[in-house]
Structure formats: C-alpha cells, structure tokens
Amino acid sequence: MGSSQLSTLLFFTIVVTFLTVVSSGRDLPGDYLRLPSETSRFFREPKNDDDFEGTRWAILLAGSNGYWNYRHQSDVCHAYQLLRKGGSKEENIIVFMYDDIASNEENPRPGVIINKPDGDDVYAGVPKDYTGAEVHADNFYAALLGNKSALTGGSGKVVDSGPNDHIFVYYTDHGGPGVLGMPVGPYLYASDLNEVLKKKHASGTYKSLVFYLEACESGSIFEGLLPDDLNIYATTASNAEESSWGYYCPGDKPPPPPEYSTCLGDLYSIAWMEDSEVHNLQTESLQQQYKLVKNRTISEPYGSHVMEYGDIGLSKNDLYQYLGTNPANDNNSFVDETENSLKLRTPSAAVNQRDADLIHFWEKFRKAPEGSSQKNEAEKQVLEAMSHRKHIDNSVKLIGQLLFGIEKGTELLDVVRPAGSPLVDNWDCLKTMVKTFETHCGSLSQYGMKHMRSFANICNAGIPNEPMAEASAQACASIPANPWSSLQGGFSA
C-alpha cells in the first residue's frame, strides 16, 4: 500500500472515530434543568444601588488564537456585553483577545461574533485593549497589578483599583495540569498566577476579587495554591484532573447555524453567562450561581466538575457586586414553576476542549466540494494535527519508560497527588522539564498541555535535568514538520 493510500485510510479512520465521539450522548433524557421557584431558598430581596460601595473592575482574557478556537474570544466578547449591560463602565473593563476571529476569512459573518446559535453579535463595541502579540502573561499580570510601567503595547489600561473596589477576572482557553494557554510567549503557570494574586492582596487595592476560570484541568491552577485569606473566591470549569467542554458545536443540540464549522462557546462559560443574563443579580449570590452552573455543567458521559477555591465565605456576596445587573431583569428574582418557568438547557452533547479543533477540520472537509483545494487543505490539517498528537503522546510515553523503566514508566507519569496538594513541589523544575522536552521534541501546543502532569511527576521523583535531556533526545529522533510542532511561537515555559 502506497503512502498516499495509507494517509487516506488514516484520515477516514480518524473521521469515523470522531463522528462517533460527536454523536455520542445525543439522546440523553432530561433536556432541561428547571430551576427551583422557592424565593427564600435561592434569592433575596434586592438591595438599593446606594448600598454599593467602591468601583467594579474586570479583566476578560481569551488565551488562544486560530479560528478553530472561535469559542474563547466569543466567550470574552459575550462577557463584555454582559458587564456593560450590568452598568460597568468601559474604562473599568480590560479586554485581552488576539482579535483574529471577527475578520477571519473562515468567519461566515464577517465582522460578527456570536456565542450561541440564535445569539446577537457580541463583538460590536468590544474594546481592543490588548490584541495580537500583546496578549501574554506578563501584560496580564501588569494589568491586574495596576503596573502601567510593566506593560508592553496595548491601550495602557490597568486595574487602578482602591481598597473598597471589587474585581472580576474571567479567563477562557485551553489548559493543562498547572498551566493555562497564551497565544504569545510562555504559558501562564499556576505558581506565578497565585504569587501575583498574593501581591495584589498585599497592595491593599481591592475589597474582594472573584476569578472565573474556563480551561481543562483548571482546578489545578488553585488546588493547594490559593490561600483562603486573600479575599479571593475562584470557581473553575473542571477539577484538577479532567477536561472542560466546548458547547454549541457542530452536531450538538442545538447546533450552531449550518454555515459555522466550529464551537461557538464553552459549557461552563455559557452556563454562568446565560444564568446572569436572566436574573436580577442583586438577588442572586455567587454561591447560588456556582451551584446552578455546577449542576448544568456535569452530565455523563461528558461534562466536568465545577469547583470552588479560596475564600468560600465570599460566595455569599451578590453577583451584582462584580457583574452589575441589567435593569431589564429587575423583576426576575425567582422562577415560577408554571407559566414563567425558566429553563436552563442541560447539555445534550458537548465536545472535549482538546478535540474541538478536529471537529472544525472535519466540518471543513465534509462541507468542501469534492476535489477542491479547500477539501485537500482540510484533510491536510486533520492529518497534521493527528500526527502531532501521536508524536507528543508517544514521545512522553517513551521518555517515561527511559527514566523509570518499561513497566513503571506510564504508571509513574500518570500519578495524581492527593486532593489539596499542588501539582508539583518545584515549579521552576517543571518549567525546565517543559523547555527541555520542547528543545528536543518540538512544541507541546494546546494539545500537549495534557502532559504537564507527566513533567511534574518527573520533577516530584527527583529526576535531574540531564537525564531528562538525554531521554528526550533519544525519544525524539525527529520532529514532525507541521505548524503544531513548530517552536516559531517560542517555548511554553
């Protein structure tokens, strides 16, 4: 069998596999989650605007680029519109997004971004504070700390908060154990983020801070790292060991409009925003939203466990303190079980964050005319992505076997520490191991983040960098020639 025949066979094997993934779980019972109607149980009487003290600040960050990651920038744009309708001022909302989606040649509605199938444009009016190469971890830290002198490029907008102010941070992208993606430069590491949060607290420049985090293994960003005495409350889309999920994807119920070939949003993000859009947020607490989002986000055989960290006592605060509230929802303080009942759609389908790019490439292939350059390009994209995945998985597995032996290698790389423990003891070691691997094996990319636990366990086992470098060089005799494996964008650490 020739190489072209093998490629074609591999491609259609991939297609069949992922069609099975996409179509699984479509007909689960219970399409809707009906919210309780007991006012006293879930909601309180609204407070007067005059009771609010301080200023609301927000940072909204989409940590990816590429049209296949449409959903992350869509999430951020939606969050911006939600905050503006809630009364937050543009000058107090700082937006980080690569801004390569709205005008992308693949976007079927040029200049428009939507976050749900029948949704309005959420892109119009969104400020471009930090875009393109300006979207990196150091600028995010500088903006959060209010350190204008540390910024590179961008609008110069920072969180210039005072001791009575309330800060809302929302991040959405790919992640892995202990790490969050960034489109430019090194990834954001949990240790660095938590040190920045401690520094912000030490500056005395906020009263409370809420962090909503959408990413795979996002619980690992705060697990064992975020103290409970910083006046910070965080919720995450998943625990420290599992994926988060794309939503409103091709094949979902409901699907995106037929002209779209990508996921429009993410399940956790859609859940908290769609809840916020229909309630008077003066009468709903962070804890109540956490429970509602948690219930919506977990569903077998997919879904994830939404988690909470930090100062759990802050969760009694009203959402209004951080998101404001839309005056149109003033009367939406509770749910009537009959005529006025609110139905939050539970997921009848969702897509693993790490597979959403493959869904996009398959949709491109499926829709492209036979024999067209578009069809050939889509096939190439799938094969390159799968080649990269196979290379990364096999390389990490072989490195584990070289370091720990054939029988114990995989087992030791996959060890999960007890709940409440951070991913790794020495974060500098983790960064060194990542850079060593990428030097010999090419970029981890958004997919390879899943192996961060393996590198952390190599550090936890006390393996020095020299044998790691030798094992990496032996495991990676060659690197696939494709964009995913390229180090053109720099190292991940």
UniProtKB/Swiss-Prot annotation:
Glycans are attached at N147, N295, N331. CDD domains: legumain_C (cd21115). One of its GO terms (cellular component) is vacuole. Residues 1-19 form the signal peptide. Gene3D superfamilies: 1.10.132.130, 3.40.50.1460. Pfam families: Legum_prodom, Peptidase_C13. The record marks C263 as: Required for post-translational maturation and enzyme activity. Asparagine-specific endopeptidase involved in the processing of vacuolar seed protein precursors into the mature forms. Belongs to the peptidase C13 family. This is Vacuolar-processing enzyme. It comes from Vicia sativa.
